[in-house]
C-alpha cells in the first residue's frame, strides 16, 4: 500500500486522569510509550499533536516530532485537520489517528486500518470493529456499536443495541442472552482519514444525530461520506482512562521488563 502517516493527539487536560500523557509507565511518560509502540506500524512519519509544553518537551527528549495545536478544538478530527494543514500534506495522503492513551496498541491494527482505506477509493475514513459476545456490552450505552453493509462500510454507529433482535428480545427478561449469530460489532476508536476529507470536515455543519448520540463520526455519515470498517477477530488492548487502567498497564510493562 502507499505510505501513510500517524498523528497521536495528546491532550494534557484529561477530566478523569489529569496529566495523563505524562503519567509514568516503567520509567517513561505514557506518550513516549505510545510513540515507541507505533514505530512498528510502518508509517512514513509519526507526529504527536499537543497543546502542552510539558508533553512537547517529553516527546522531543525521546527523539519524537511534535506539532503544537490549538487548545480549543471541539473534536480530535478538528485537531488532526489542523496538523494536516500545518504540515502541508497532500489531499491523497492517508493519516491514522492513534489515541495518546493506548500504550499497548497493536501496530498491526494501525497498518491494517490504513490499508483498508487505501483499498477503498470511495471511502473517506476507515476504522475497526470486533464482535461482541456479552449482552451487557450490547446494552451498555458507553459501548459504541456499528452495523455494516456487504462491502464492510458502516451503515450506522450507535450507543443503542444495533442490530435489534426483534423476536429474541420481544420481552425485557429475554435480553440477558445474545441470540446465536446476531452480528453485533463493537466500534474501536481508531481512524484513518484521507487528507482531502479532513480539509472539508471542519466546514461541515454538526449533524443532529451526531449531537444526540455524541459520536463525531456520524457527522461524516450525515453529510454522505463513506466509512470503511476493518473487522477484527477480537478486542484490541484497552486504553487508559482511569487510575485503575493506568495501574493495569504499568503491571503489563513491569512484567515485560
Curated annotation (Swiss-Prot):
One of its GO terms (biological process) is lipopolysaccharide biosynthetic process. Keywords: Cytoplasm, Lipopolysaccharide biosynthesis, Nucleotidyltransferase, Transferase. Pathway: Nucleotide-sugar biosynthesis; CMP-3-deoxy-D-manno-octulosonate biosynthesis; CMP-3-deoxy-D-manno-octulosonate from 3-deoxy-D-manno-octulosonate and CTP: step 1/1; Bacterial outer membrane biogenesis; lipopolysaccharide biosynthesis. Its EC number is 2.7.7.38. Pfam families: CTP_transf_3. InterPro entries: Cytidylyl_trans, KdsB, Nucleotide-diphossugar_trans. The keyword Cytoplasm applies. It is found in: Cytoplasm. GO terms for molecular function: 3-deoxy-manno-octulosonate cytidylyltransferase activity. It catalyses: 3-deoxy-alpha-D-manno-oct-2-ulosonate + CTP = CMP-3-deoxy-beta-D-manno-octulosonate + diphosphate. One of its GO terms (cellular component) is cytosol. Activates KDO (a required 8-carbon sugar) for incorporation into bacterial lipopolysaccharide in Gram-negative bacteria. This is 3-deoxy-manno-octulosonate cytidylyltransferase. It comes from Azoarcus sp. (strain BH72). The lineage of its organism: Bacteria, Pseudomonadati, Pseudomonadota, Betaproteobacteria, Rhodocyclales.
Amino acid at each position: 500500500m502507499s505510505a501513510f502517516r500517524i498523528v497521536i493527539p495528546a491532550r494534557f487536560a484529561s477530566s478523569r486522569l489529569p496529566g495523563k500523557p505524562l503519567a509514568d509507565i516503567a520509567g517513561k511518560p505514557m506518550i513516549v510509550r505510545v510513540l515507541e509502540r507505533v514505530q512498528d506500524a510502518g508509517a512514513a512519519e509519526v507526529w504527536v499533536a499537543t497543546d502542552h509544553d510539558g508533553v512537547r518537551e517529553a516527546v522531543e527528549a525521546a527523539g519524537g516530532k511534535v506539532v503544537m495545536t490549538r487548545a480549543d478544538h471541539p473534536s480530535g478530527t478538528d485537531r488532526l485537520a489542523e496538523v494536516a494543514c500545518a504540515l502541508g500534506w497532500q489531499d491523497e495522503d492517508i493519516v491514522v489517528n492513534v489515541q495518546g492513551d493506548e500504550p499497548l496498541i497493536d501496530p498491526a491494527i494501525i497498518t491494517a486500518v490504513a490499508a483498508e482505506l487505501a483499498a477503498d477509493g470511495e471511502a473517506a475514513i476507515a476504522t475497526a470493529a470486533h464482535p461482541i459476545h456479552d449482552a451487557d456490552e450490547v446494552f451498555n450505552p458507553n459501548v459504541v456499536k456499528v452495523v455494516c453493509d456487504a462491502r464492510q462500510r458502516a451503515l450506522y454507529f450507535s450507543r443503542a443495541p444495533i442490530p435489534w433482535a426483534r423476536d429474541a428480545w420481544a420481552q425485557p427478561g429475554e435480553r440477558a442472552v445474545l441470540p446465536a449469530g446476531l452480528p453485533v460489532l463493537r466500534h474501536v476508536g481508531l481512524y484513518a482519514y484521507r487528507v482531502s476529507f479532513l480539509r472539508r470536515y471542519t466546514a461541515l455543519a454538526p449533524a443532529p444525530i451526531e449531537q444526540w448520540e455524541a459520536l463525531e463520526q456520524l457527522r461524516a455519515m450525515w453529510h454522505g461520506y463513506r466509512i470503511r470498517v476493518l473487522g477484527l477477530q477480537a478486542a484490541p488492548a484497552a486504553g487508559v482512562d482511569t487510575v485503575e487502567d493506568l495501574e493495569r498497564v504499568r503491571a503489563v510493562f513491569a512484567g515485560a521488563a
